[in-house]
Amino acid sequence: MKALKSHPVIAALTLTLTASLAGFSLTHSARRGVAETRGALPDLPEANGAATLLPNGWHITPAGTHIPLPGDLPLKMVFSPDGKYLIVNTAGWHDHSVNVIDLATNKVAQSVNVGKNWAGMCLDQVGKTLLVSGGGSPEASFLKDAADMGATSEQLASFHHPILRLSYADGKLTPLTGLDIPGLSDNAEKIPNDYHINRERFVAGLAAGKNGAFYVVNTQNDTVYKTYVDADFMKSAPISVQVGYRPYACALSPDGETLAVSNWGDQSVTFIDTQSMKDYGRIKVGSHPNEMVWGKDGRLFVANSGSNSVSVIRGDKVTETIKTSLSPTDPIGSTPDALALSPDGKRLYVANADNNDVAVIDVSDRRESKVLGFIPTGWYPSALAIAPDGKTLYIGTGKGLRFRASAPATTPWTRTQPVSGLKYDYIGGLLSGTVSVVPVPNLHQLYAYTRQVYANVPKMPVEIERRAGPRALAERSLHNIKHVLYIIRENRAYDQVFGDIKTGNGDPDLTVFGEQVTPNAHALAEHYVLLDNLYANGEVSEDGHKWCDAAYATDFIEKAWPNSYSDRGEPDADERLTDSPAGALWDNCRKHGVTYRSYGEAADFTSTPDAPPVFTGDKGLAGHVNTEWAKFPFGVGRDTQRAAIFLKELNEAEKTGQWPQFMVAWLPEDHTQGLKPGAYTPVAAVASNDQALGMIVDGISHSRFWKDTAIFVIEDDAQNGPDHVDAHRTVGLVISPYVKRGQVDSTQYSTASLVHTMELILGLPPMTQYDRNAAPMLDSFTGSPDLTVYANIGSKVDLEAKNPATGPGAAASNRLDFSGPDRADPDALNAILWHALKPGQPLPAPVRSARLARQ
């Protein structure tokens, strides 16, 4: 198999660069068969020009001009038949809309609020009817909000349709009655009262075929439907076929005879004969296949979000695997999730959502495709389209170009209408969608774009042997640590807890759980290092725990949580879609001979009165969990009881000398249950969490293991708590004899920074691009250990205080679901907590900063 060369123009440009770029070559090509590509990551200086620094440490410098959308997370783009308009949906947390962009003015000419939709959209073959996937059945609370915000009876009734329908003519959309599929529709007569959620539906991909046929992918029941419609009604009962686990997209071959279906959770593509609707084959591809596009030559390109790759299928096999990451040797973390093919079939464009770029690939030679370069985008590109003339690329970004500052509170139903009683917005509402308009670059411009994309990646220090000074000494000291305890807590922002610490960048006016409530957290922050520039990678618990455990959230999680948290529902899925293909920290430990144990994190149990608990958590933790934790699921028991279980095992380890190298513990009580009658008060709940932290640190520091132990503490997310810097800024601690004393470390860190530092200690390789590139916490460590022990500080508040049966906030809290983390509306819960603890004071706005690094 011959080695492939880089593009000659790119190679020529390389020779003209300075010495720091010597050797950079985009030798980033696919080979014949399924062999992967080779390449090199250049050592680039910081690019010139304005850049936005994200909370995760990555920069964005989006190319082109930008069209704001009324909502977030655009997932599909469709051109009008005459090519004058681009139709774009938004399917995130706030406005779900279908938007018509006038390409002559690059402005949204029309926006239709559809309430809910998802990942499928197509025009029929005559270009007069637009079909849009309806996603799942919304929660009753969403319907109530929609009704309260002025939704018409027709709009409310439309939510029961699995497929939305709009007429299209001359750049204008007109809503029509939606389409039903037997078994997938809701009972419209029960909307909004006595509404029953249809758990069998979550409609994703759509494709329009010949003679009025169209094809519907239902992710929820692993089924594809074929049916026919005319202008007014469905002509016949649909024909269905089972495909792989959780299908996502469908694409018709150029001749219309074959339908390809990407099986999102099954690492495969199913091929269906459109005449007989028979499955005639399934081809294995990469992890988490999502979007697909056919070439006129019969090749099918499949984006594999969990493999940093595109599979090229020709005939009955994969003939190429094209790596789309910045280097072909990169671990996962690029997340290709959208494709566009130039009209001449020579260029493939691939949106790398988590790299914030579009890969440009020469696919003109069917034997060997080549990655030519990358175009920088906004935050999380999620949709692509190439103009019919091939001259302009349209890039939809799921999270926008920058952070949106404080604004009046809105609901998922409509972003444009303020909500009475709530003054400020929820974190989901702070995300924004855009369409970037980028002229297709020539190779010289593409090379400049490529340099910028590389410059946007967080820069890592050089190898330790090349270092000198305190940071080198600190990193070498990490190797003296043999045991790591990783404590994950729930949902607190920095200023909520540490805003009253004068030495840090805090705002005491925003502090609701200050030193009086959390004396141990405060003492530990002041005795060791105060981390006042630490940010959660995740927005909410659904992605936050994934970032904590695996330094990555899959594209399924990123596309599902905005729907779930806005009460529009989400498709059911197991670890095949929810978990990182690279595994979690405990999987990393297992692969490299590091002992590990979980105390509650990802360690679910089911139980019955007549049988012992059965472990149903992460498969990689089977046999490595503390089963006593099953007695205290979320909302049951106290964190002090959980800490006692941990200390019991620590005492046993003292006797044997055997203690795991890596341990992870979940202490969730600081989530609180609001003012739910009979539950522990928010202050008592957070104080119990703080006592548990103090107990654990006290116990470890007095043990034989203290001399070579490090404890890392993080919140899974900041959940939009009040913070004057950014709504992602969160509470974290690092505690060890090798941690500095009495210092403030204002280095910008993220959740992935903690993961990276723990990996360095344990001798583990990075799992993803995010932990690999995150700044390790070297500035918090020292080469001179201090073995001073820590003594738990007793609670200064009543740990047993409970909420009264009535009073402000009781009724609102009773309406919330506290059966699991974030099942309660986090925005409502934060408002309840603020008004309970800061009576008479207006709830402050969540702040979103454009640049977070301390100058």
How would you describe each model-predicted region?
Residues M1-L4, N106, V112-W118, C122-V132, ...:
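Intervening/peripheral non-core polypeptide segments
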Residues A11-G23:
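Bacterial N-terminal signal peptides
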Residues Y447-Q855:
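N-terminal pro-sequences and low-complexity stem/linker regions of secreted or lumenal proteins
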Residues F24-G469:
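Predominantly soluble domains enriched in secretory-pathway, periplasmic, or organellar proteins
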Residues L13-T14, T270, E291, R404, ...:
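Short amphipathic alpha-helical leader/targeting segments
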Residues A3, L26-A30, E36, D297, ...:
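Intrinsically disordered, low-complexity sequence elements enriched in Ser/Thr/Gly/Pro
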Residues K2-A12:
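Bacterial N-terminal signal peptides that target proteins for export
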